[in-house]
Amino acid sequence: MAQMMTLSLLSLVLALCIPWTQGSDGGGQDCCLKYSQKKIPYSIVRGYRKQEPSLGCPIPAILFSPRKHSKPELCANPEEGWVQNLMRRLDQPPAPGKQSPGCRKNRGTSKSGKKGKGSKGCKRTEQTQPSRG
């Protein structure tokens, strides 16, 4: 009788612990479920990440991060040529003296009428891309 009670209690404890070990990464992962039907322009993208089926997502995908942080990531098929070209372009460091597409520094006068102040988000030093791995 004592063995039966111990076995039941052990089974209950095990059953309660299993869901916590499966979700111990801090929550579920956002997965792309279908690909965008339109080509995504370089001018609206700031970076990307890869989605692998081996990590629990249903399809392989490239998730492009839009420049506007309030917008959702854009999913694309990693086998399409335009997707590979866009990834290559994002991986390249910007040419010296070139600004990112979203930077408006030195494009005339600001609202206050002062020149040369630069605009929010524009860096005066050379920008570097974070390494992808």
From Swiss-Prot:
Subcellular location(s): the record lists: Secreted
What GO MF terms are annotated? CCR7 chemokine receptor binding; chemokine activity
Q: Where is this region: C-terminal basic extension?
A: 98-133
Q: Where is the signal peptide?
A: 1-23
Record keyword Repressor present: no
Keywords from UniProt, A to Z, are: Chemotaxis, Cytokine, Disulfide bond, Inflammatory response, Secreted, Signal
Q: Which cysteine pairs are joined by S-S bonds? A: 31-57, 32-75, 103-122
Tissues where the protein occurs: Expressed strongly in lung, spleen, thymus, peripheral and mesentric lymph nodes. Also expressed in the testis, kidney, liver, and heart.
Keyword match Secreted: yes
Any single GO BP term: immune response
PANTHER family with a match to the protein in the record: C-C MOTIF CHEMOKINE 21, SMALL INDUCIBLE CYTOKINE A
Q: What function is annotated for this protein?
A: Inhibits hemopoiesis and stimulates chemotaxis. Chemotactic in vitro for thymocytes and activated T-cells, but not for B-cells, macrophages, or neutrophils. Potent mesangial cell chemoattractant. Shows preferential activity towards naive T-cells. May play a role in mediating homing of lymphocytes to secondary lymphoid organs.
What is the protein's quaternary organization? Binds to CCR7 and to CXCR3. Interacts with PDPN; relocalizes PDPN to the basolateral membrane. Interacts with GPR174.
Q: What is the associated disease?
A: Mice carrying an autosomal recessive mutation designated paucity of lymph node T-cells (plt) show dramatically reduced numbers of T-cells in lymph nodes, Peyer patches, and the white pulp of the spleen. Plt seems to correspond to Scya21b.
Recorded protein name is C-C motif chemokine 21a
Q: Its encoding gene is what?
A: Ccl21a
